[in-house]
Amino acid sequence: MLDKRCSGILLHPTSLPSRFGIGDLGDGAFQFIDFLADADQSVWQILPLGPTGFGNSPYLCYSALAINPWLISLDRLAEEGFLPPSLLDQAPPFTNPRVDYDQAIAYKSQVLKQAFAQFRTNIELAIEQEFAEFCQAQSDWLADYALFMAIKEAHNGAGWHQWDKDIAWREPEALKIWGDRLKTEVLYHQFLQFLGFRQWQEVKAYANQRHIAIFGDLPIYVAHDSADVWANPENFCLDPETGEAAMMAGVPPDYFSATGQLWGNPVYDWETLKATGFAWWIKRFKANLQYLDIVRIDHFRGFESYWGVPQGEKTAENGEWYPAPGKEFFQALGKALGDNLPIVAEDLGVITPEVEALRDEFNFPGMKVLHFAFDSDRGNPFLPFNYSNGNAVVYTGTHDNDTTVGWFQERSEDDQQKVINYLGCVCNEGIHWSLIRLASSSVAALAIFPLQDILGLGSDCRMNLPGTAAGNWGWRYHPDQLNDWLSGHLSFITELYGRRIYHTD
């Protein structure tokens, strides 16, 4: 899949600049693409784009197929006639330099409802037709998602398994009653998806026009409280009485955690999925490839075997390994989408030879993270001289790591010296540029750097601290932080290590 050496930047759209408290798909997105192009980058990596709930984690979404409506640019809606421009002039001040989820969601929700009212009363024929075509094109999932969100709001946010049994288990009469009762609310959520997809497709088209590929995340598991599970309960291991997860996903105890990690997502009923030819998974991939060029599968090892923890357990200690039909699944996916699947395998953690064999059979690139390269001896697989071939994506760090500056500062003097000994020296521009150079010089076909590392920022700017529920997903950059020196220096390194791709247009 990765047939040319190249590089790119990791930045979730919520981290883009905007004047409404959260990054969006407005001018900031287009300006960031221009920065990528000016720096001779070829890839923009993002986190999952789905609608987030409690905790604002993009890895815990109400749908694996929908787009987060809080990413919708209000300025662009005003430009397109969905809002009177004067309305946005009355916006409250957003003074928090980080994402202010509470204030941003409260304000944007109010304004988006006004856009919906404008859409319903002053609809243009062309927009009406475009909306109808969108709803038809996304009919596999959109109606279920919109009804799920409308019913959830009518239940004050309660999870679907807490609803009355008739609607929780989708009895036809209950679906009709709720659909009729919440017809306007369902239309509203369809409208938000129409706007979100419309704006994202314009962003993606501009990125592709500037020779930037969009590289996104696809978590293997979906949230229990999601339209995906509610609309397709047969695909998941659920308690038939309560609707709760009968078998929960996680990972077993290891050196880092004596009790393992219990994620709580329901694991898949792979026998049912296999009997349908993996139809739900194929639909999911097709939907994601509408707005992504490359897909990173989070927790890839779960396609070879997965750790299942019985209902009622409080930790992951008492789970078991269960086989998963990874080979059959990827064969079916290749048959549906073509053999050269644009997939990167997140193969971090405890990876067995069987997982590596599955990855290699389908020629999926794996991941290398330089922050993990200096924690053991010279056989460490993350050290660049141990990369067996170029079919890999190398990172300075990921969204789950500290920034490179923060990572280096937190190391002991002895550990810092190990890093310096390997590098030879720390370049004048700082440790972050030294690791960017190290990643760029490796044989890995694709090198990815979080924007925080390009900017040389510290621990206060990390995106996520795994295992913590608060304070994550909030970092944003200021537009003044991107400048000609940065793009020029990154372009120089990209050219120096053979990662610049030349284009004729």
UniProtKB/Swiss-Prot annotation:
Pfam families: Glyco_hydro_77 (PF02446). The keyword Cell membrane does not apply. One of its GO terms (cellular component) is cytoplasm. It comes from the Bacteria. It catalyses: Transfers a segment of a (1->4)-alpha-D-glucan to a new position in an acceptor, which may be glucose or a (1->4)-alpha-D-glucan. Keywords: Carbohydrate metabolism, Cytoplasm, Glycosyltransferase, Transferase. InterPro entries: Glyco_hydro_77 (IPR003385), Glycoside_hydrolase_SF (IPR017853). GO terms for biological process: carbohydrate metabolic process. Its EC number is 2.4.1.25. One of its GO terms (molecular function) is 4-alpha-glucanotransferase activity. Its main location: cytoplasm. It is found in: Cytoplasm. Belongs to the disproportionating enzyme family. PANTHER family: 4-ALPHA-GLUCANOTRANSFERASE DPE1, CHLOROPLASTIC/AMYLOPLASTIC, 4-ALPHA-GLUCANOTRANSFERASE DPE1, CHLOROPLASTIC_AMYLOPLASTIC. This is 4-alpha-glucanotransferase. It comes from Synechocystis sp. (strain ATCC 27184 / PCC 6803 / Kazusa).
